[in-house]
């Protein structure tokens, strides 16, 4: 692992797609020791460009023994990152309440498109949906022409992963003073709307 400002910080990442892995890649690039929990039977981590700089363990989170392994990793971690739909981690027995029982200093980072609560919380969505609702899509492109979708740079990575990484770093700093963990609830639509605030 590389040294950097997050050297000595342990992160447990629950494998997902898009902004969660990108956030963990950034944390790893800053020196954090990231262990990614992959689903048993899924594709190899080596094929994922954003998986650089971290180790992986494959677990079946519907198996009580594997959940116990995950909780043991969480107990020794500084940070947890997950990007599932609201309620999934709680149903697995790995939500913030359960995790804080084994590690009260844990920074629990959550990434969703719409947030943990609200009318769209459980709706499916993708980067294009998040940047459209936040107004960013309308602002991209030339006047009088259709918008030019910016891949998933504005929503998933800009409004999502970067805001979650910034929240995690701030929470780690605060935990040094308070000795307490906290939940970072990063919604891609919120981060993208914040980016639009400078326009």
Positions of predicted regions on the chain:
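Acyl-CoA thioester-binding alpha/beta core of soluble enzymes
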Residues: 1-41, 71, 83, 99-109, ...
């Amino acid at each position: 692992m590389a040294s950097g400002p997050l050297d000595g910080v342990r992160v447990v990442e629950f494998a997902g797609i898009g902004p969660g892995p990108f956030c963990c890649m950034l944390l790893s690039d800053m020196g954090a020791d990231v262990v990614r929990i992959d689903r048993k039977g899924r594709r190899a981590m080596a094929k994922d460009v954003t998986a650089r700089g971290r180790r992986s363990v494959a677990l079946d989170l519907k198996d009580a023994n594997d959940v116990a392994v995950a909780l043991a990793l969480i107990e020794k971690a500084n940070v947890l990152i997950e990007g599932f739909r609201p309620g999934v981690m709680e149903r697995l027995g790995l939500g913030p309440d359960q995790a804080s029982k084994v590690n009260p200093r844990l920074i629990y980072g959550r990434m969703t498109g719409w947030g943990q609560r609200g009318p769209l919380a459980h709706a499916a969505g993708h980067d294009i949906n998040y940047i459209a609702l936040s107004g960013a899509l309308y602002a991209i492109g030339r006047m009088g022409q259709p918008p030019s979708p910016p891949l998933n740079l504005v929503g998933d990575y800009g409004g999502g992963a970067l805001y979650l990484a910034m929240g995690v770093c701030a929470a780690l700093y605060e935990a040094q003073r308070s000795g307490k963990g906290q939940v970072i609830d990063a919604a891609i639509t919120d981060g993208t709307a914040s980016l639009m605030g400078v326009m």
